[in-house]
Amino acid sequence: MSTTTLTRREQRAKAQHFIDTLEGTAFPNSKRIYVTGSQHDIRVPMREIQLSPTLIGGSKDNPQFEENEAVPVYDTSGPYGDPEVAINVQQGLAKLRQPWIDARNDSEELDDRSSAYTRERLADDGLDDLRFTGLLTPKRAKAGHRVTQLHYARQGIVTPEMEFIAIRENMGRERIRSEVLRHQHPGMNFGARLPENITPEFVRDEVAAGRAIIPANINHPESEPMIIGRNFLVKVNANIGNSAVTSSIEEEVEKLVWSTRWGADTVMDLSTGRYIHETREWILRNSPVPIGTVPIYQALEKVNGIAEDLTWEAFRDTLLEQAEQGVDYFTIHAGVLLRYVPMTAKRLTGIVSRGGSIMAKWCLSHHKENFLFEHFREICEICAAYDVSLSLGDGLRPGSIQDANDEAQFSELHTLGELTKIAWEYDVQVMIEGPGHVPMHMIQRNMTEELESCHEAPFYTLGPLTTDIAPGYDHFTSGIGAAMIGWFGCAMLCYVTPKEHLGLPNKEDVKQGLITYKIAAHAADLAKGHPGAQIRDNAMSKARFEFRWEDQFNLALDPFTARAYHDETLPQESGKVAHFCSMCGPKFCSMKISQEVRDYAAAQTIEVGMADMSESFRAKGGEIYLKREEA
């Protein structure tokens, strides 16, 4: 852990330098590949890890090698992972999905922004230096049209986004020929449908059934299509965002790029500080992954942080503002009902969700029902016009082990199920947010209740944390719960960083949280038996047994840390080919001994075979040529 503390000015300067010098970068010994779909502009990015050959025999002067296949892996880094792409943050990313959106002919450009707040910001010349220069002209659905992926799925139409996703979810495993790499243990999937091969039609069917969502606002054409659902790979979300006391636009863009490099499938901008609108524009125009927000945070800023002063009109304006910028999914705390708030009085830690506490305070102050619940159909109408997915927030999630699985939590969950059905009436895609703090033996009930109450809509959880005693290590405490609930069927895991409960995460914290959660998600995929999930593990194990150190580093989720730890004790180049590491040394390496045992066993088999043949030869009279028996 770094002990160097930078001043605010130094942090901003460092982030600005990162942005100014940003270029497409591949991981060590990896290359970017593209798998093409049925039309030329469906080009699905993957990272292919190149491996060295295995020494199988020969002599020192004439060694014999056997090639090892490259291993393709899912890649969330977008253009930032392609060394051939010129990166310019000032201009933003290429608009990958724009031709697909235009071809559907179901949306139109707006003459002006629908949000009064957006119009005010654009008219403020004092913001010119902060503003992203290449602003898009926003689109919305034409009158009488719905533009959502759910709408098209229900019509039986496979969109280019769905085909892109099918290719992506298969992870290029059809390229693998080695039986060693293809071997996979059967999983326990708790009722999930995991086809051997994911087709565009399967993607369409899952979206149509509401079991999966494709967050893809028509005003975020830069994003690469991805899917969230329990019958697909488990996804990971990273949270970024400024606060009233720290961070800047430069730092948030840096964290966005950093998040996608380390595997974030989506990113939530949870900014609560200054210049929220401008920060979000920079993030969206440079994001290859879907962006989510919690609109109530910005709505609260618009009323000077006074929850009692919130109004539906201010919130509605915020939804329009963010939808026309391109936000792909909104967290809406519409399930925090007035009658549920007293249920939290007996809790140890009360209401820990920021959005939940804001709405609870508003309800009690006015003694009225939650205006998000009351206006939910209007929220759905807005989302349907831009294809903004809804992430129904768990405002009453437990904030401590003692409060897990209580009446308030599950009452809200049942209401979220009712709201899900309403959203589906408008062809709006929905996922459900979940806890929180839950001990291991109580986690599975959360998944079971969600599937039953919310009609199998995708579940999206924060951890859950499995113990409360480890501040500073809550990426571990929650990673345990995340792996478990991912196995049980959770579709997306919201990462937790080492700074959880302590402070705003920095760049290194983001990386640590993501690595922890990529481990949890992958462990869940293995346990479910997701087709192809074990390929990378098999490749790593083979490289480990064959002492191919460079391949071990490069197959790791974090090649740089793996190499650094190895080189702390064996930094010489000879250490990269040694048949041992510093843990056991040359004489006690179990894998080296195992290889020797295998070689010895093979030699013994040959000797036994020769002895058997010798005995057979003598038993037949010792003749070189045996007489042919007469018929």
From Swiss-Prot:
**Matching InterPro entries, A to Z?**
ThiC, ThiC-associated_dom, ThiC/Bza_core_dom, ThiC/BzaA/B
The text of the family note is: Belongs to the ThiC family.
| This protein's pathway | Cofactor biosynthesis; thiamine diphosphate biosynthesis
Q: Which residues are noted in the entry as [4Fe-4S] cluster-binding? A: C581, C584, C589
For this protein, the record's NCBIfam families field holds: PRK09284.1, PRK13352.1, thiC
What are its cofactors? [4Fe-4S] cluster
Entry protein name: Phosphomethylpyrimidine synthase
Question: Lineage from the top down?
Answer: Bacteria, Pseudomonadati, Pseudomonadota, Gammaproteobacteria, Enterobacterales
Name the source's superkingdom.
Bacteria
Which species is this UniProt entry from?
A: Salmonella paratyphi A (strain AKU_12601)
